[in-house]
């Protein structure tokens, strides 16, 4: 595996201190990333293992495209057991930044962390030199101080993935941070903390071997000039512009005349009109601080930044001097929910300081700096929605001890005072009092505080599954398509394949034409909140969405941008290129590849996930024990009939039929929703079939 892959697995046993090297080629049929992670976990972590057991593992895995220079390819897939959902099933975190590329440059496809150190350690990797170092002096520090200390000891070029106090204290909703603001959540911080592993620091100098450099350059140019859009691959601007046939105010292609990076070094820089075709200006298209926080963020925005080899630059960078008053750095930034979630807990909104809406901007920068430094994770905003529910419904008053309730400054909360966020996050990260259990996750607090059906069925709380995870582009995103997608994983689905297509900004007529070309019928694609009953084309759409996210998490590519379903070019009739992943794969690895072969590999990975979930749950009946949906999805908008304009609620019978059709499409048992022996064998998973059969977990 000389091109693309490194061929190496680094196994680190924290209990014994042994560090060994293994051959990754044995897992080649699983491609990399998510596929490697699932196969290793399936083989090595048996049912009954708990997240904080020494027997649990943490698998960091890259793919053949990682670090290659292919656009948007610096992702590492982190696989372990969930700390925060019912059953502690297998989950993934997906971390951007620079860690994945440095892993590859150092010579590793995979890092397996197993066992538990007797005292705090950090893992030091410099190419072939790997060692465990004492971390007592780092324990108790936040992610940023930890990163700075390790870089002083190693090199400014070292990429550090570190946990903060939340991970040390085994807070289930915790993660790790690399490159200051690129996070891997899903409880992985607590897994590291349970193993006394403070950080992994990696610096590589080897690079990634490319089979055909000329073709690689041609594909990069092709993608950058003809296919790529903005964040989430939105391909039209958010405002009417001289070059654009279409615009959509919801588009993340927000660059326009008169919109500036207001705090840029050397003076404001105008984003301007950015027509497609010029590779050098792609990074101006997306302006997430204004998109996420509103116009008040413009004057504080220094620039947009992002991950290694990503031209989109969706990570906003701001500088607000007055946030130092709250004991945090004046600079910081993030993207998406992490940018704006922190002030959502204020029932009356955040208090402004000088300008209209600056309280939201300032409060969120304070919040995200604290949150990231502690290494907390918001579960796609569910932590903050749970806080709002428990406060507004009187749960805190009922379950918190009187002394604890009295000492919390609820008056600051009502006033929108940012100091409340400081105290709130400190309590969560340091496990102070009963309130801190909020960061145990939704399932845990529902059990602990006896929240009942009112909690699970509350539409504003957005809990998708009674396993304790929220919606992530679900029924509001192509109805049955998003609903099926949200049922399939063991956390929020982290799938953007379908929502990127929906949100592309192109008019409905064009989107339906593309849907017909891809899925056989225009009826695969409905207008938002004007949905129709399930049909075969929608099932194909759902399968494609799931297989593409598995593919992206395996090769690895960023599913916030990929696939190239549509294009910003009128000359292409706005059509994208779904074979582009395969073209890059061939150029990088030198192996013949088609999109059909990659889709088959993705199906193998997805089915392995399903099989491992069956094994961990010790049940074949996935329909009735796993693929469950909270009641609000069906009961919202009681005054509007289902399948009429104005609602995105689902119909119970239709969803039952949808799952049956999807199971058949996947080759799973149509009633139980578990993989069959025939399908496992078709996908080259004979060993999995034999193992499930031995445990009576195959359908008759």
Swiss-Prot record:
Induction data: Up-regulated by the oxygen-responsive transcription factor FNR under anaerobic conditions. Repressed in the presence of nitrate or nitrite via the two-component systems NarXL and NarPQ, respectively.
Any matching Pfam family: AFOR_N
UniProtKB keywords: 4Fe-4S, Iron, Iron-sulfur, Metal-binding, Oxidoreductase
Binding site for [4Fe-4S] cluster: 307, 310, 314, 558
Record's cofactor remark: Binds 1 [4Fe-4S] cluster per subunit.
GO molecular function, one term: metal ion binding
Signal peptide: none
Intrachain disulfide bonds: none
Entry EC number(s): 1.-.-.-
Cofactors named for this entry: [4Fe-4S] cluster; Mo-molybdopterin; tungstopterin
Highest taxon of the lineage: Bacteria
InterPro entries cross-referenced by the UniProt entry: Ald_Fedxn_OxRdtase_dom2, Ald_Fedxn_OxRdtase_dom3, Ald_Fedxn_OxRdtase_N, Ald_Fedxn_OxRdtase_N_sf, OxRdtase_Ald_Fedxn_C, Tungsten_al_ferr_oxy-like_C, W-dependent_AOR
NCBIfam families given in the database record: PRK09849.1 (NF007354)
Family stated for the protein in its record: Belongs to the AOR/FOR family.
Name of this protein: Uncharacterized oxidoreductase YdhV
Provenance organism: Escherichia coli (strain K12)
């Amino acid at each position: 595996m000389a091109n693309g892959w490194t061929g190496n697995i680094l196994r680190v046993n924290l209990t014994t201190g042994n560090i060994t090297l293994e051959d990754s080629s044995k897992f080649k049929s699983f491609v990399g990333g998510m596929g490697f992670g699932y196969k290793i976990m399936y083989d090595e972590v048996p049912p009954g293992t708990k997240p904080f057991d020494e027997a649990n593992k943490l698998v960091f895995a890259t793919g053949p495209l990682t670090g290659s220079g292919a656009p948007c390819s610096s992702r590492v897939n982190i696989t372990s057991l969930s700390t925060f959902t019912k059953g502690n099933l297998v989950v993934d975190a997906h971390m951007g930044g620079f860690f994945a590329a440095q892993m590859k440059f150092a010579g590793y496809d995979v890092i397996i962390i197993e066992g538990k150190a007797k005292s705090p350690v950090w893992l030091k990797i410099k190419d072939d030199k790997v060692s465990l170092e004492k971390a007592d002096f780092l324990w108790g520090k936040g992610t940023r101080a930890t990163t700075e200390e390790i870089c002083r000891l190693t090199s400014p070029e070292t990429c550090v993935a570190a946990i903060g106090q939340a991970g040390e204290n085994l807070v289930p909703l915790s993660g790790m941070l690399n490159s200051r603001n690129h996070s891997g959540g899903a409880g992985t911080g607590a897994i590291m903390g349970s193993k006394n592993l403070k950080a992994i620091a990696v610096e590589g100098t080897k690079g990634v071997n490319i089979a055909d450099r000329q073709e690689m350059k041609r594909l990069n140019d092709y993608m950058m000039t003809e296919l790529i859009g903005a964040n989430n691959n939105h391909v039209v601007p958010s405002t009417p512009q001289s070059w654009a046939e279409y615009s959509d105010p919801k588009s993340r292609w927000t660059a326009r005349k008169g919109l500036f990076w207001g705090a840029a070094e050397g003076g404001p820089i105008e984003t301007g009109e950015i027509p497609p075709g010029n590779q050098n200006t792609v990074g101006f298209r997306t302006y997430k601080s204004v998109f996420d926080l509103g116009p008040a963020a413009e004057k504080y925005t220094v620039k947009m930044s992002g991950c290694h080899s990503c031209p989109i630059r969706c990570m906003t960078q701001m500088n607000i001097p007055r946030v130092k008053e709250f004991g945090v750095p004046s600079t910081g930034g993030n993207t998406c929910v992490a940018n704006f979630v922190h002030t959502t807990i204020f029932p009356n909104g955040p208090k402004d300081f000088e300008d209209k809406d600056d309280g939201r901007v300032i409060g969120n920068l304070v919040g995200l700096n604290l949150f990231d430094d502690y290494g907390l994770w918001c579960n796609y905003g569910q932590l903050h929605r749970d806080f709002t529910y428990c406060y507004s419904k009187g749960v805190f008053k009922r379950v918190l001890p009187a002394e604890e309730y009295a000492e919390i400054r609820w008056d600051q909360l009502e006033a929108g005072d940012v100091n409340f966020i400081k105290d709130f996050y400190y309590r969560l990260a340091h496990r102070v009092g009963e309130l801190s259990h909020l960061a145990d996750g939704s399932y845990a607090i529902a059990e602990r505080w006896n929240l009942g059906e009112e909690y699970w069925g509350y539409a504003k709380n957005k809990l998708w599954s009674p396993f304790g995870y929220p919606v992530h582009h679900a029924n509001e995103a192509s109805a049955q398509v998003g609903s099926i997608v949200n049922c399939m994983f063991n956390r929020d689905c982290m799938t953007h394949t379908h929502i990127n297509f929906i949100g592309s900004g192109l008019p409905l007529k064009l989107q339906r034409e593309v849907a017909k070309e891809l899925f056989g019928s225009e009826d695969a694609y409905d207008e938002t909140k004007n949905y129709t009953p399930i049909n075969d084309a929608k099932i194909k759409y759902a399968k494609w969405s799931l297989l593409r996210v598995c593919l992206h998490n395996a090769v690895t590519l960023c599913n916030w941008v990929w696939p190239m379903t549509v294009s910003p070019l009128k000359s292409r009739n706005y059509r994208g290129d779904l074979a582009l992943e395969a073209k890059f794969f061939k150029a990088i690895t030198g192996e013949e590849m088609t999109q059909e072969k990659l889709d088959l590999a993705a199906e193998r990975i997805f089915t392995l996930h399903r099989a491992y979930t069956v094994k961990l749950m010790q049940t074949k009946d996935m329909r009735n024990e796993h693929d469950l949906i909270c009641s609000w999805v069906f009961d919202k908008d009681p005054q509007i009939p289902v399948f009429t304009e104005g609602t995105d609620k689902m119909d119970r019978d239709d969803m039952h039929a949808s799952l049956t059709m999807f199971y058949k499409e996947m080759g799973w048992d149509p009633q139980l929703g578990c993989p069959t022996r025939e399908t496992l064998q078709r996908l080259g998973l004979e060993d999995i079939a034999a193992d499930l059969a031995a445990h009576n977990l195959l359908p008759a």
